[in-house]
Amino acid sequence: MAKTLYEKVWDAHIVVAAEGEAPIIYVDRHLVHEVTSPQAFSGLEVAGRKMRAPEKTFATMDHNTSTTSASLDALSPMARTQVQTLERNCKEFGVRLYDIHHKNQGIVHVMGPELGITLPGTVIVCGDSHTATHGAFGALAFGIGTSEVEHVMATQTLRQLKAKTMKIEVRGHVAEGITAKDIVLAIIGKIGMDGGTGYVVEFCGEAIEALTMEGRMTVCNMAIEMGAKAGMIAPDATTAEYLKGREFAPKGDNWQQAIAAWAELKSDADATFDATVVLQASDIAPQLTWGTNPGQVVAIDQFVPNPAEETNSTVRSSIEKALEYVDLSAGTLMTNVGINKVFIGSCTNSRIEDLRAAAVHAKGRQVAEGVKAIVVPGSGLVKEQAEAEGLDKIFLEAGFEWRLPGCSMCLAMNDDKLEAGDRCASTSNRNFEGRQGRGSRTHLVSPAMAAAAAVAGHFVDIRKPY
């Protein structure tokens, strides 16, 4: 029987599939951070349980850490308690921890892949909604709740219902300057923020195959923003080249065996999907969101939509509400929208490729007057590589702030927040009301678009001189 990539990985991980019950699947890798793990560890303590396989759990500090200082003194009392609790729990239960002083510390969805913790064909979970990032490697990766975190710790399994399958094919090749972020925003714009609900999405097509692993991670990272359970991309030579030699990747004979096994991790030619979506890559322009969800997105050369032109009353009301919150007028050309904050970072766009793309637009220029722009590498390894390439100097000379790794301004949980009324060009993944701070306005863009906005003081079409 022909199978999709998702079905192959799913079937290989079923432990028990009793009739009339949700199957129990095995979990290969469990990633944890300081925010969603304390209650889970506490639950184990109360029940007197040990972890089933502590060597398969990896922990880092990222959500509530400071990006200006590696000192605990720089943290709020709540954040300090969270990181200290994680440190204590990891020590007690024997979990490998990348704390704020570790050279490999970083955002969990950046750190995991770059260390080779993320591998094709595995099931990966984390108490974080953007766990789908790891699907870029052909893994089945999805976010779980805190009670499920405890369950995985105790049993290394989860009870899960099988999802429907969706194929999203991006045919042909994108124009120069069009990035993975533009591709995934265009996809979300086409199917909407709930178009993938109930599905595991497989991204494919020439435009997807041409992406680097960094780009593929950006695409899968935002699968959740279209409502999908997970996003996956079949592993190939690009995947193997990225993983080869990384700390937790297979070595020696095991590597050759892994390569052979990974070659089978692709949807069969005659496999059927429950839904199929097709985009033409050549139609994709630089994208940016105008409203309060990732599906409210347009191309840079387009206008803020007019709710009066929308025939669906529910959609019309949503547009009106979003326009009121973001304080934009219908019909405004997006290149006329000014910004006063820029955030380059997050688990969506804080890898070395992202920083290189942003640096191209920062080099030899200056951040516009009245604009504050920060660059936050996704991990210690990304920061180290960027500094070896001199990217930090490019940003600093242009007036950007160069920070320590962490989730930072993606969410209003740490000290990196926007003020009410701020308008931010952000490379993150969510532009919900208050996501970056109460009353803040977020426009999701690629790293190149964010850096260009920083120096121009407004959004620009990076395909043209500015």
Curated annotation (Swiss-Prot):
Gene3D superfamilies with a match to the protein in the record: Aconitase, domain 3
Name of one Pfam family that matches: Aconitase
A single GO molecular function term of this UniProt record: metal ion binding
Pathway participation: Amino-acid biosynthesis; L-leucine biosynthesis; L-leucine from 3-methyl-2-oxobutanoate: step 2/4
PROSITE patterns for this protein: ACONITASE_1, ACONITASE_2
Domain of life: Bacteria
Transmembrane spans: none
EC number: 4.2.1.33
Co-factor: note: Binds 1 [4Fe-4S] cluster per subunit.
Alphabetical keyword list: 4Fe-4S, Amino-acid biosynthesis, Branched-chain amino acid biosynthesis, Iron, Iron-sulfur, Leucine biosynthesis, Lyase, Metal-binding
Catalytic activity: (2R,3S)-3-isopropylmalate = (2S)-2-isopropylmalate
HAMAP family: LeuC_type1 (MF_01026)
PANTHER family referenced in this protein's UniProt entry, alphabetically: 3-ISOPROPYLMALATE DEHYDRATASE, HOMOACONITASE, MITOCHONDRIAL-RELATED
Function of the protein: Catalyzes the isomerization between 2-isopropylmalate and 3-isopropylmalate, via the formation of 2-isopropylmaleate.
Subunit structure, interactors included: Heterodimer of LeuC and LeuD.
Protein name: 3-isopropylmalate dehydratase large subunit
Species annotation: Shewanella piezotolerans (strain WP3 / JCM 13877)
Gene: leuC
